[in-house]
A protein has these predicted regions:
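Secretory/organelle targeting and membrane-embedding segments
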Residues: 1-89, 93-417
Length: 417
């Protein structure tokens, strides 16, 4: 049934007739015979091929236990030449570089890499997928997509809510692990990657890995000058949060990618909870003309978007006497393209897994490369304790210390003052 739409109850009934629930102890390999019997029964009843996907929407502690039980019960492989076994795993993919490597090694001992699907729902969003199409199918953009024409790039994901009922998980994760290591890093890779030789999963994922490996590592001095962590006032009073917690609910960071395309171009990440607006954005700031004739006249406006969209802004002369310049937008909104239903991010990603298309799923080497960049920051924060943890009021734009990143004149108007 489409959200907000009428639907055929008969179709829903037909679908639900083929949905089954099975209760068993998923930590005990001896119990998995129940799952095997149910699979074999349903395959025979409906004449189904031996094609099975295991989806682990479970606590992270189960990411090693369940695959091990599948191995011990023989459910990790198929004897059918036309069959397959695939496993989908939700984030977090480890909590550090070491734990990510351990998890990857464990999974690859049980499944082949091409059978492992590490899901990030951000990559299932239509606008995110359209980044690649926008870049590589339009001759107007790709020649400009480099350090010669781009001044800086901002990628942000902000929320108005706090941790709500996720205090136990969030206090052990924080904004860096929860948002930046996966969602924002993946978004950045689509913005920064080189064109793949062909539009197929492995060439695309090869280019993503190259981007992650090209990020300039931080020195300890860099971490203090280029990374800001914050915590909203009242976080320590949240349910299941330690009263002396140093977990960050806000991160702003500046970094560079050391390759030809992005030499000298600063990238910025912003993410946080209890901020003024809920928004996910990628903002490309193009360089100004060498000689500014209309200084101060091309002012920016609100860039609030309630729908998925792509917007290109440029200055034009207003009608009438004089040369009053106004910033105007050329917008593309998905809801104006078609009245047909836009699939949810998970719908797209689950269908891809069924079809064996891993383009929008994280590969193990990309995962480890992203952790290699993030891990030193987390270790530095652990050593510092509460030092350089800045507090901000709920509903504000985050800690004032964010200005040390030097982006205060470039940041998006709808995110920060």
């Amino acid at each position: 049934a489409q959200k907000g739409k009428t639907y055929d109850e008969g179709l829903i009934d037909d679908f639900l007739e083929n949905v089954y629930y099975l209760a068993f102890d998923s930590t005990n390999a001896d119990e998995y015979y129940k799952l095997r019997e149910r699979i074999e029964f349903l395959q025979e009843k409906h004449d189904l091929p031996d094609k099975i996907i295991y989806y682990l929407a479970t606590p992270p502690v189960m990411y090693e236990i369940v695959p091990q039980c599948l191995l011990e019960s023989g459910l990790n492989k198929t004897e059918s030449p036309d069959g397959f076994r695939r496993i989908i795993i939700e984030k977090p993919f480890g909590t550090s570089l070491e734990s990510a490597r351990q998890l990857n090694d464990h999974l690859r001992h049980i499944f082949h890499e091409e059978e492992i699907y590490r899901i990030d729902h951000y990559l299932g969003k239509e606008t995110v997928q359209n980044i690649l199409v926008l870049r590589f199918s339009n001759g107007i953009f790709e020649p400009l997509w480099n350090h010669n024409y781009i001044d800086s790039i901002e990628i942000s994901a902000t929320e108005t809510l706090g941790v709500e009922n996720r205090g136990k998980y969030y206090d052990g994760a924080g904004a860096m692990r929860d948002m930046i290591q996966n969602h924002l890093m993946q978004l950045m890779s689509f913005i920064a990657m080189e064109s793949p030789s062909i539009f197929e999963p492995e060439p695309i994922r090869d280019e993503i890995v190259k981007v992650f490996r090209s990020i300039r590592p931080y020195t300890v001095l860099d971490m203090d000058k280029m990374v800001v962590r914050g915590q909203y006032i009242g976080y320590r009073e949240e349910k299941n949060v330690a009263p002396d917690s140093n977990t960050e609910t806000y991160v702003a960071m500046k970094f560079f990618i050391d390759n030809w395309r992005w030499s000298g171009v600063p990238f910025y990440f912003y993410t946080g909870k209890k901020l003024p607006e809920k928004s996910s954005e990628v903002v490309i700031h193009f360089k100004s003309t060498p000689h500014q004739l209309f200084v101060g006249q091309c002012s920016g406006g609100s860039c609030n978007k309630l729908n998925e969209s792509i917007s290109l802004k440029f200055g034009l002369k207003m009608p009438g006497a004089g040369f009053e310049v106004k910033q105007v937008s050329m917008d593309f909104r998905y809801d104006s393209l078609s009245k047909s239903y836009l699939p949810d991010a998970y719908e797209r990603l689950l269908l891809d897994a069924m079809l064996g298309d891993s383009t929008l799923y994280a590969r193990s080497d990309a995962l480890e490369a992203s952790w290699k960049f993030i891990d030193p920051i987390l270790l530095h924060w652990k050593e510092e304790g509460s030092k350089n943890l800045f507090f901000y009021e709920p509903g504000e734009d985050g800690p004032e210390e964010t200005v040390i990143l030097g982006a205060e004149k470039k940041v998006c108007a709808c995110q920060r003052r």
